[in-house]
Amino acid sequence: MKPVFKGLLPATMLLVGMAGGLWAQGQREPSPKSQIRLQKEVRHELVMLPFYNVFDNFEYKVDGNTVTLMGQVTRPNLKSDAEKAVKQIEGVERVENRIEVLPLSPNDDRIRRAVYRAIYGDAGMERYTLQAVPSIHIIVRNGHVFLEGAAATEMDKNLAYLRANGVSGVFSVTNNLHVDRT
């Protein structure tokens, strides 16, 4: 009986080693094409959320099969809806939700509306309102305004900053807009 076990142990170890190698082959790094596809699908799912608007900002990072969600939202349910939508995408195994829910504040709500009117009421900026969700997002936290997203030109970026900075009750304006050269 001892000789059978002596031969069986190395054979078992060999099979376990081969199975581990096959499993590791199945866990390859995602290809660049699959990463680009995932990025496009994540963006699509986020912008299609029903309550996503100009006062919310989503950012995300795709790393392999993990998606990290970041940004700011005005409604708590939008944070959870974003996570649910991204989890349903084929190829996403894990979602880290780092989205900040902005505090409720009547003063911040007033500033949001005033900054929106100041930016999008300008004759040079009206074309941005033709989009379902304008590309310049207005984030207000405790009286501080953050402009996020994209502007078509450097002039639009600067004009948005000047308009937001001229609103009464705004403590500061941080212009995080990038110029979209497409």
Region annotations inferred by a language model:
Residues K2-P10, L14-T182:
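N-terminal targeting leaders
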